[in-house]
Amino acid sequence: MDLAAYWDSLPWQQRDLGGWTADSLAEGLAAFVAARHIAARQPAALRSLDILPGRAKDGSPEAHTLHLVPGEVVCIVGPTGSGKSRLLADIECLAQGDTPSRRRVLVDGSAPDPQWRFSGEARLVAQITQNMNFVMDLAVADFLHLHAESRALEDADEAVRRVLDAAVAMAGEPFGADTPLTQLSGGQSRALMIADAALLSPKPVVLIDEIENAGVDRGRALNLFVEKGKIVLLSTHDPLLALSGHRRLVIRNGAVARVIEASPAERECAQRLARFDRSLAGLREALRRGEPLDEAWSRLRF
């Protein structure tokens, strides 16, 4: 059915109340399609993100300027209430000295375009929080198809398959394309959104809040973002995750108190922790399967 036939098939009440004519509908559709293709050809190409120092909670000046580049993972550590979430919020809104911390965020060395701050579609930052639940009554595949089609991807089916495969690989419990979104567990929801943000979203900056509480494979999640060239900032209390980044920011009293570059010695510590973590994950899976603890323990290396 072409557009003219579709227009003629509508009840006169719907045509009248909509405020459209056949010509204006055709013009609006053409403009929408053109805008979709422009957005698909011109993704946000970010070269760097700079975070200029602001002030601590007591008003004292912050000491560190941060320079972030695509493919970099930066971990944010500090006690609860130290200001980790404030830093993430400043980056999310590309703060320009208009937040309590007085920080400024520069995009490619310059102040950001206002639409990158205030337009939902044009914003450069995606955030994955601790609590994520779906309210749409759709199957997983239908939801992913909607997102893929909105990005004007040439092969939406292939994009959906890649996102679903990545999400299932990260989740503790498998789920399928026909699973309703509202029936996903917290970990499954988080895995789906991580895969979606990495593989479908054009946002070049991703903020993640305490992924260790998500019930997902943390290593797979981080690797997915790095492979796609995202700038990743990760707030965490997990020692393995804290050692998995290129550097980590120590937050104290609302300010960046220290920047620690990952050293070879820390890389070795991370490898040891990773082996321990894999053994612990195996023990966890054995308990889920109902195996006796002593049998599982004898097979694992601690």
PLM features: what roles do these ranges have?
Residues 80, 85:
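Walker A/P-loop
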Residues 178-184:
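Conserved ABC ATPase signature
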Residues 35-60:
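N-terminal pre-Walker A segment at the start of P-loop NTPase domains
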Residues 186-206:
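GG-anchored amphipathic helix commonly corresponding to the ABC/SMC/Rad50 NBD signature/C-loop
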Residues 254-288:
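Conserved beta-strand-loop-alpha-helix hinge in the C-terminal portion
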Residues 74-76, 88:
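Short hydrophobic beta-strand immediately N-terminal to the Walker A/P-loop
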Residues 243-251:
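Conserved catalytic segment of ABC-fold P-loop ATPases
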Residues 88-150:
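ABC ATPase nucleotide-binding domain signature region
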